[in-house]
């Protein structure tokens, strides 16, 4: 248990940051899932639109160091390949 005022404050700050970071990580995963779902449905226009929005979200979260920049780049690359594959199949 945090006994000093400083320790109590750090515990409050950590809880607040954890809550905020969890929400951003959830947003990251949701953006990826929405693009994947559109690709699986075969909706080329929707997939491209969602991909553009997902890239913006992924970059923002990587800039804030919620996820590592390499993980963000890998995610964007895989989504781009999926969207491009959908266009090639059509």
From Swiss-Prot:
Keywords: Ribonucleoprotein, Ribosomal protein, RNA-binding, rRNA-binding
Lineage top rank: taxon: Bacteria
InterPro entries, sorted: Ribosomal_bS20 (IPR002583), Ribosomal_bS20_sf (IPR036510)
The species this protein was found in: Burkholderia cenocepacia (strain HI2424)
Family designation: Belongs to the bacterial ribosomal protein bS20 family.
GO cellular component: cytosol; small ribosomal subunit
Name of this chain's protein: Small ribosomal subunit protein bS20
Disulfide links within the chain: none
Renumbered residue ranges of the record's region Disordered: 1-25
Molecular function GO labels: small ribosomal subunit rRNA binding; structural constituent of ribosome
One matching Pfam family: Ribosomal_S20p
Function of the protein: Binds directly to 16S ribosomal RNA.
A single BP term in Gene Ontology: translation
